[in-house]
Swiss-Prot record:
InterPro entries: KsgA/Erm (IPR001737), rRNA_Ade_diMease-like_C (IPR023165), rRNA_Ade_Mease_Trfase_CS (IPR020596), rRNA_Ade_methylase_Trfase_N (IPR020598), rRNA_adenine_dimethylase (IPR011530), SAM-dependent_MTases_sf (IPR029063). Belongs to the class I-like SAM-binding methyltransferase superfamily. rRNA adenine N(6)-methyltransferase family. RsmA subfamily. This is Ribosomal RNA small subunit methyltransferase A. It comes from the Bacteria. It catalyses: adenosine(1518)/adenosine(1519) in 16S rRNA + 4 S-adenosyl-L-methionine = N(6)-dimethyladenosine(1518)/N(6)-dimethyladenosine(1519) in 16S rRNA + 4 S-adenosyl-L-homocysteine + 4 H(+). The keyword S-adenosyl-L-methionine applies. The gene is rsmA. It is an enzyme of class 2 (transferase). Its EC number is 2.1.1.182. S-adenosyl-L-methionine binds at N28, L30, G55, E77, D103, N123. Specifically dimethylates two adjacent adenosines (A1518 and A1519) in the loop of a conserved hairpin near the 3'-end of 16S rRNA in the 30S particle. May play a critical role in biogenesis of 30S subunits. It comes from Rhodopseudomonas palustris (strain TIE-1). Coiled coil: none annotated.
Length: 287
């Protein structure tokens, strides 16, 4: 019998530790151990791997990660009520669960990794999911400190992450995500699997960092994407004017018709326009 079989049911853990989900923390607890195991398996073989988990709550996914064979799980939890539940799990897996009490938006796990590359696996709190992802995608140096991310989002956000040009959901987030990572939508999870049930379907996404993304000035890429998608129904010749460089110069560098709209431009086109923007600014600075 595995250690996870000896742990109490998650509903009992929630009751005993008074862990009613708090909307202010973006909490929706996933209690179905079959689904938590499926998420853990989506991160690939975990033997010898350190996993960083954000917002473990009562520890359903934490248990699955450890039972699946993770060498070590670093669990970052802001809700102090959950710490006791996590400590019970740690007692069943001596030396394999590090519990960090703090805000994931402010915590840097790299000093705890001892030079190893981790995998991030999490049912992210909805209210900080996108800012966390953007922070990880903007990590420097690159390749980053993690080798894979398996993350749960609201389905609408997940669609925006994996979208390609000409998709309705394609936008700034997709450009950044697909520039730096290979993205894949894995599976959906019904609201009924959570306590309390959210109003929307959730989706699990896998992101694997590209070893060598197309060379690009990241700040310029974000600026070009923001300008283009900020007025997504306008042609690029109009939407890019706010950047202070002739839009025709940017689109010409990418071989793009300035009459096109943002949603039709692939990531490589945004990279080319961003590099032209950065070069143009550098030349003006030197002049």
């Amino acid at each position: 019998m595995s250690a996870i079989d000896d742990l109490p049911p998650l509903r009992e853990v929630i009751r005993r530790h008074d862990l009613a989900a708090r909307k202010s923390l973006g909490q929706n607890f996933l209690l179905d151990l079959n689904l938590t195991a499926r998420i853990a398996r989506a991160a690939g073989p975990l033997e010898g791997v350190t996993v960083v988990e954000i917002g473990p709550g009562p520890g359903g996914l934490t248990r699955a990660l450890l039972a699946t064979g993770a060498k070590r799980v670093i669990a970052i939890e802001r809700d102090e009520r959950a710490l006791g539940a996590l400590e019970e799990i740690a007692a069943h897996y001596p030396g394999r669960l590090d519990i960090i009490s703090g805000d994931a938006m402010e915590f840097d796990p790299r000093p705890l990794l001892n030079g190893d590359r981790a995998r991030i696996v999490a049912n992210l709190p909805y209210n900080i999911a996108t800012p966390l992802l953007i922070g990880w995608l903007c990590a420097e140096p690159w390749p980053p400190w993690y080798e894979m991310m398996v993350l749960m989002f609201q389905r609408e956000v997940a669609q925006r992450i994996v979208a390609h040009h000409d998709d309705d959901a394609y936008g700034r987030l997709a450009v950044l995500a697909n520039w730096r990572a290979e993205t894949q939508m894995l599976f959906d999870i019904s609201p009924s699997a959570f306590v309390p049930p959210p109003k929307v379907t959730s989706s699990v996404v896998r992101l694997v960092p590209r070893a060598q993304p197309e060379p690009c000035d990241r700040a310029a890429l974000e600026q070009v994407a923001a300008a283009a998608f900020g007025q997504r129904r306008k042609m690029l010749r109009q939407s890019l004017k706010s950047l202070g460089v002739d839009p025709a110069q940017l689109t010409a560098a990418a071989g793009i018709d300035p009459a096109r709209r943002a949603e039709t431009v692939p990531v490589s086109g945004f990279v080319a326009m961003a590099n032209e923007l950065a070069n143009s600014r550098a030349i003006r600075t030197q002049a």
